[in-house]
Amino acid sequence: MDKTVKLVFQDGLEIEGKSFGAYTSAAGEVVFNTALVGYNESLTDPSYKGQIMVMTAPMIGNYGVPDDKAMINEIEAWMESNQIQVTGLVVSYYADDYSHWNAIQKLGAWLESQNIPGIYGVDTRMITKKLREQGSTLGKIVADTDVAYYDPNEDNLVDQVSCKEVIRYNEGADIKIVLIDCGVKNNIIRCFVNRDVEVIRVPWDYDYSTLEYDGLFISNGPGDPALCIPTINNIKESLKADKPIFGICLGNQLVSLAAGASTFKLKYGHRSHNQPVQLVGTKRCFITSQNHGFAVDDSKLPEGFKTFFTNLNDGTCEGIRHESKPIFTVQFHPEAMGGPVDTEYLFDEFIEEVKKYKNANA
């Protein structure tokens, strides 16, 4: 019989459930994700670093977990990073039995192998309503030993998830992109490599000014963007030039801060595969995959920048664009994984801008 554990919130609420995964205690920021599928991608997304993820889908684990060591083009084939990034997992019903052609193990066994606790048999609907009404809060999964509450937003999480040295993918390709790794998802790299781009992946605080490249990309990542001061300073220098710049999620926030805008923490964030965004100036709507707890205040955008996309649920900024330079960023995830790929065309737009720049400066 599975052991009993508790989900404890900072306000004192305790919810009892059953343990799966590692029988251990862990603390972090409690957030909810409304995606129906894609838990292996979500669990390995570096943007979830330091967070306890509540899945609102009623059954989790029924299609198991694929091989997390399988590699394609030197990138994990089925995961978004090389390890589970969440601090803990909360589900309503955990399916220990699984069935999928690509699965090799149970979700619980995978969590246990990386010492990540899970709790099931709890009312995730009630928990989600609590987070929606009160906002994301600190919490902990308590097993045999209690632990202190932990606020991940006080730490520089980007430093923890970024690569430690320069890594190159698809070397020799004609187009070269510097990718600032703030916790990049693997599918972003795949999207570039699949378009025959050489990706030069650099650490979050790396001085890339000495490298030869044609365009700059700033990745997604966890935590408060204001803590990434070296990255912001490097981007400030890049904004002075004319090379194309593209940012996703945290990258959107960092480019905005470098340009002189500000960011703020959302009440409970956007974490789902069904966030509607509108292309500003049109009636065009896209359904997007999102995972972020901070947003850009587009009421104070600096001169030369304008809002690119807007969230149709709460009206928040979903991207910015420069009026004359090839610079644009989005808060959502056009690479998806999981989620819809309706906006993956943005990679093509960026590469076209890079080609124009490269040809003009040949």
Regions found by a protein language model. Give the residues of each.
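RNA-binding accessory domains that recognize and position tRNA/RNA substrates
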Residues: M1-D205, P225, M337, E349-A362
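Cysteine-nucleophile active-site neighborhood
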Residues: N220-I287, G293-A295, G339-K358
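Catalytic beta-strand/loop cores that center a nucleophilic Ser/Cys/Thr
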Residues: R284-K325, N361-A362
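Beta-strand-turn-beta hairpins that frame and shape the catalytic cleft
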Residues: E171-I177, T282-C285, H322-I327
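Phosphate-binding active sites in nucleotide-utilizing proteins
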Residues: K176-V178, C182-G247, L254
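Active-site glycine-centered loops adjacent to acidic/histidine catalytic or metal-binding residues
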Residues: D123, C249, H292, H333
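Active-site-proximal beta-strand elements of phosphoester/diester hydrolases
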Residues: K176-D181, T288-S289, F328-F332
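Proline-centered loop/turn at the N-terminus of a beta-strand
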Residues: P117, K176, P244-F246, S262, ...
